[in-house]
Design a protein with these regions (language model features):
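A conserved hydrophobic position in a structured secondary element of the catalytic/binding core
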Residues: 177
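Sec-dependent N-terminal signal peptides
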Residues: 4-13
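N-terminal pre-domains immediately preceding structured catalytic cores
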Residues: 17-116, 120-131, 136-154, 161-172, ...
Length: 324
């Protein structure tokens, strides 16, 4: 509730005098609950999100609880580190990098390719074989989307160069950078709040319109969910949709029909929203959307944890490809 009120106060400065008077009158007559109801309506208006993002730096996505972004280009053979401060991406350093000898996207174990996409860093390793330099950051490959695409392999790291000085022209699929820079990064970043975005060719900046469409879309989807509007809710799912456990769209529809038929009242709150572009070789615009979901249903079921979506945009509307 406090977050929502703060969220509304930030938006307050963009309201007309008449809208402010109306909000104050609603508060006077109905209290905080009335204000919440009014502010919730703004979340369902794309123009709100367009205005919200207008002055923010969103070239690598929209992040509420990420501090650093690694941006890699396989074509340019480089890796850049950006720090996110006050919704601006500040370049910390850019260095040449070595990628897998197979220039394509990674598909199977042992194909010597560096994966393309968006990946969290999951661990920091030290005391490795000298081949990997002083340390390595472990990426989340294969992520949820990769696994559902039947991609295999593991052990994709950002690591250093051999300590014996025998530098190679390519890696087995990892990203390798010079040891001094890697050691510097170890001191500067919190890997748990760092994401790696790897592009197959030139870096394509995320569009504000796409990000506004996604933010608007997930809140309309949420509203349909809260109000048991099955048709609207299901309209956000692509025909190619696959749930984390392999359930495809036809069975998912039937499952949700049974769930929505209970007509339970529920509350659903989203926070800590992170939206990253998800590059690919096929050129289709995809995004990874991750946030904290706080779900409470009348029947007693509760969930508070991470929701992960992979989405695309079709005809100006998000379509969910993968969900967990």
């Amino acid at each position: 509730m406090k977050k929502l009120i703060f969220f509304g106060l930030i938006f307050w400065m963009n309201l007309s005098a008449n809208e402010i008077y109306n909000l104050v009158d609603e508060y006077r007559k109905g209290g905080i609950s009335n204000i919440k109801s009014t502010l919730e309506k703004y979340l369902l208006d794309k123009s709100y999100w367009s205005n919200f993002l207008a002055k923010k730096d969103t070239k690598f996505g929209y992040f509420e609880n990420m501090d650093f972004v690694f941006v890699a280009s396989k074509k340019s053979q480089n890796l850049a580190l950006y720090k996110l401060e006050n919704q601006k991406f500040i370049l910390q350093n850019q260095t040449s990098a070595i990628f897998g000898s197979n220039g394509n996207d990674k598909m199977v174990e042992g194909d010597l390719a560096t994966p393309v996409g968006a990946y969290d860093l999951t661990a920091k390793l030290k005391n490795l074989d000298q081949y990997y330099g002083p340390l390595a950051f472990v990426t989340a490959y294969p992520n949820l989307y990769d696994r559902l695409q039947k991609k295999t392999g593991s052990g994709i790291w950002i690591h250093g160069l051999p300590l014996n000085g025998k530098r190679e022209k390519a890696t087995k699929g990892c990203i390798a950078i010079d040891n001094a820079t890697l050691t510097r990064y170890e001191k500067e970043i919190d890997y748990k709040k760092t994401i790696l975005i790897t592009y197959p060719s030139d870096i394509v900046e995320a569009s504000k319109d796409a990000l506004a469409t996604i933010l608007h879309g997930i809140f309309v989807w949420r509203d349909a969910w809260i109000n048991n509007d099955l048709d609207l809710y299901l309209s956000f799912y692509d025909e190619s949709f696959v749930r984390f456990d392999g359930m495809k769209i036809a069975h998912f529809r039937e499952y949700k029909k049974r769930v929505f038929a209970k007509d339970e009242s529920k509350s659903i709150d989203f926070s800590d929203i992170n939206i990253a572009p998800y590059p690919s070789e096929d050129g289709i615009e995809r995004y990874r959307v991750r946030f904290t979901e706080d779900y409470k249903a009348q029947g007693g079921y509760k969930f508070n944890g991470t929701k992960e979506l992979y989405v695309t945009i079709k005809a100006g509307k998000i379509k969910i490809l993968v969900e967990k």
